[in-house]
Amino acid sequence: MASLPSQSCCYQGFRHSGAPKGTLSMVKDIEVYTSYPPDKSTEYGVLILTDIVGHRFSNAQIIADQFAENGYFVMMPDLFLGDAVPLNKPGEFDMGKWRSGAYHPQGKNHLPETVDPIVEVCLSEMRSKYQCKKIGAVGYCFGGKYVVRHLIPGKMDVGYTAHPSHIDESELKGIKGPLAIAAAAKDNIFPAEKRHVSEEILQEVGFPYQINLYSGVSHGFGVRGDMNAGEVRYAMRSAFVQAVEWFNEYMKEK
């Protein structure tokens, strides 16, 4: 694998201050959070694929709004069909059972067979209803796998992922567009050896790539980091700017 499966660090962290400005609506049977740029343009879209805390987590919604403030129409779907994991969930929790659908009321799993169609519905909606000319995708942790899986012409034009999880090497080898990665120096899911493997693969596939390594931070810093810790706050803000600049470079016409 280019990164390892999700662990408990994937739902632990801190809630940030601020009030989301976007709206919740339905695309078919999928709830989505959308946020518009100041000029209301949908020419350039960003699809955010969240970590397992999900699209209703206020931190994720605030990040979506920040991408919108930087000139992008943003859609962020419920990848888990109502079965996201609460932040800092107490008690025992079996990640394997969760992935297999054991905790979902209808037994819906959280594997590609279920998640891929959600991503495809949203991409189609962005292309058809919203007439997005170019689509960039952001994947945090769990969502990073699906950025990599769909980074092909006609789906996603540009990709970005922070502290990705559960990506197979074959998936990374299959990308057909520019990909940027924000990595944490302290990350059991995307450790140094996996970063190095990923770098070798990205060199081989030949598309533009970027891997930024942030010291002093752990898995999840891009969404759930402690904003009271200066090093973490800097890394989170820098990783966000990394994504915006990546999209500006590879999505927008010069």
From Swiss-Prot:
Gene assigned in the entry: tropI
SUPFAM superfamilies linked: alpha/beta-Hydrolases
Q: What keywords appear on the UniProt entry?
A: Hydrolase
**EC category:** hydrolase
InterPro entries xrefs: AB_hydrolase_fold (IPR029058), Dienelactn_hydro (IPR002925)
What is this protein for, i.e. what is its function? Answer: Hydrolase; part of the gene cluster that mediates the biosynthesis of the tropolone class of fungal maleic anhydrides. The pathway begins with the synthesis of 3-methylorcinaldehyde by the non-reducing polyketide synthase (PKS) tropA. 3-methylorcinaldehyde is the substrate for the FAD-dependent monooxygenase tropB to yield a dearomatized hydroxycyclohexadione. The 2-oxoglutarate-dependent dioxygenase tropC then performs the oxidative ring expansion to provide the first tropolone metabolite stipitaldehyde.
Please provide an example of a Pfam family that matches this protein in its UniProt record. Answer: DLH
Q: Under the GO molecular function aspect, what terms does this record hold?
A: hydrolase activity
Residues of the active site are 141, 187, 219
- PANTHER family reported in the protein's UniProt record: DIENELACTONE HYDROLASE, PROTEIN AIM2
Give the EC number.
Answer: 3.1.1.-
Q: Can the keyword Hydrolase be found in this entry's annotation? A: yes
Record family assignment: Belongs to the dienelactone hydrolase family.
Organism (species): Talaromyces stipitatus (strain ATCC 10500 / CBS 375.48 / QM 6759 / NRRL 1006) (Penicillium stipitatum)
Q: Which superkingdom, per the lineage?
A: Eukaryota
According to UniProt, this protein's pathway is: Secondary metabolite biosynthesis
Give the taxonomic lineage as stored in the record: Eukaryota, Fungi, Dikarya, Ascomycota, Pezizomycotina
What protein am I looking at?
Hydrolase tropI
